[in-house]
């Protein structure tokens, strides 16, 4: 209602403008009214009291999940930051510092919550025209640097994690789509340095999501929430053997340096801030072809430490073939990495195209290397003080492809880079599409595309050429830039 009153005041201002400015002013106010309508639609989805409305019930659960995990992400990120600045601080001491800030330590800004509410209908119902119509739209979050754009789209990502788990298996004209696993959100960056900076914040969110899942697997499923970093081979390893060799080399070196250990992307635990020992806390397991990164907490108070409640350590994947075999819920990538789609068939698993699943090694695509999982059955095996039970390979349905694609720093995708990225967008859009409904009523579902930037120019033209979509800028500028 407050936004509606504000728009009414802008209408009065517009009427007082010179006649030649009225068309532009009218267009700006219409954009504001459209945002108001969408905001109310999203809010009504959460407040619908109809007990028979499955969509509203699921939306409320996913919204609560989002708020819980984002609160934990904010608080835990600050705790880790305080402990990084002062290693003498304990987790309890850092927590008290954050608690003293009250609600300010973890609260939404108005534009963040409004942006999320506006997108909820497109996530809950994948067939809505704004997302999957003949002329779908891309949503552009335009806000100054440091204003909180990251939290806005991380919040929407968390909602997406939750709603997919609640919707579960969906019948489609071409067969079953399984939303209980697979990549839910695909987030792309242009600069590799920027990816590393954001990876820590996103990992903290995934830690919060995984703890919530473990507390209530009946609601949030048996499959772990994980985050993956899919970037160039100079930044992270392509194969398990490369990662294993890195770990061996670091352990054989003098000192405690993590130089050359690209499988480890942060020096301290994103959940509690405890330092990670590259010689002891990064473990390669041949039996599963997995690399586990643990928090360095020796008292096992952190759930992601050895002996902690999480079991497998931090929910992080940084090796390409691990990512293909265990498609992470949240995948962070650089735009150049999508060139691998033309050369690595197993990367199709990121879009749900899997044919089998090994109980030990993960999902299989016809191009999965037989050196990783070439048998139909595996005998029990002991390694590192742990026994891995016998495992078999079983046929599975297609995993649900990404529902949300986030492009950070859109203004950098221009010129020659924009031309190259645009070539892959059609492929990504096609790989992420699937049909929902029955017979003639079946609708082609496309991913929701969100872009963010602190500076924008010719956004309509840029988005049309990159994604073949119209663009909706939020917040609408109305009468003032």
Across the structure, where does each feature detected by a protein language model lie?
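N-terminal helicase ATP-binding lobe
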Residues: 1-481
């Amino acid at each position: 209602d407050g936004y509606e009153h504000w728009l009414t005041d802008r209408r009065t201002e517009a009427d007082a403008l010179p006649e030649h400015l009225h068309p532009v002013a009218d267009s700006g106010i219409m954009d504001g009214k459209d945002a108001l309508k969408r905001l109310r639609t999203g809010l009504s989805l959460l407040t619908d009291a109809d007990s028979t409305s499955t969509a509203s019930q699921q939306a409320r659960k996913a919204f609560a999940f989002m708020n819980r995990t984002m609160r934990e992400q904010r608080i835990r990120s600050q705790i880790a930051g305080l402990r990084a600045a002062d290693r003498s601080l304990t987790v309890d001491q850092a927590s008290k510092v954050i608690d003293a800030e009250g609600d300010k330590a973890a609260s939404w800004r108005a534009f963040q919550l409004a942006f999320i509410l506006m997108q909820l209908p497109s996530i809950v119902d994948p067939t809505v025209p704004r997302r999957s119509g003949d002329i779908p739209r891309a949503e552009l979050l335009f806000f100054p640097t440091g204003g909180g754009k990251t939290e806005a789209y991380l919040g929407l990502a968390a909602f997406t994690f939750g709603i997919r788990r609640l919707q579960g298996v969906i019948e489609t004209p071409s067969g079953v789509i399984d939303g209980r696993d697979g990549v839910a959100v695909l987030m792309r960056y242009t600069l590799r340095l920027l990816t590393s900076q954001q990876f820590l914040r996103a990992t903290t969110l995934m830690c919060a999501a995984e703890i919530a899942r473990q507390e209530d697997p009946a609601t949030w499923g048996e499959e772990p929430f994980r985050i993956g970093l899919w970037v160039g081979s100079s930044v992270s390893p392509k194969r398990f053997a490369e990662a294993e060799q890195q770990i061996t080399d670091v352990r054989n070196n003098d000192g405690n340096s993590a130089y050359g250990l690209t499988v480890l992307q942060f020096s301290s635990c994103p959940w509690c801030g405890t330092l990670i020992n590259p010689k002891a806390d990064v473990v390669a397991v041949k039996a599963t072809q997995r690399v586990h990164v643990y928090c360095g907490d020796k008292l096992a108070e952190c759930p992601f430490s050895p002996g902690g409640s999480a079991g497998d350590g931090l929910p992080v994947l940084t090796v390409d073939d691990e990512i293909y075999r265990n498609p992470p819920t949240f995948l962070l990538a650089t735009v150049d990495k999508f060139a691998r789609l033309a050369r690595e068939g197993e990367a199709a698993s990121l879009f749900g195209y899997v044919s089998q699943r090994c109980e030990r090694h993960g999902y299989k695509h016809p191009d999965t290397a037989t050196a990783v999982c070439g048998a139909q059955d595996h005998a029990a095996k002991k390694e590192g003080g742990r026994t891995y039970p016998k495992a078999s390979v079983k046929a599975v349905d297609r995993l649900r492809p990404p529902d949300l694609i986030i492009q950070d720093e859109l203004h950098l995708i221009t010129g020659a880079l924009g031309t190259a990225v645009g070539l892959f967008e059609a492929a990504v859009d096609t790989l992420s599409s699937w049909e929902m409904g029955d017979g003639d009523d079946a609708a082609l579902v496309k991913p929701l595309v969100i872009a963010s930037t602190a500076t924008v120019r010719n956004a309509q033209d840029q988005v049309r050429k990159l994604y073949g979509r119209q663009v909706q800028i939020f917040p609408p500028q109305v009468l003032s830039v």
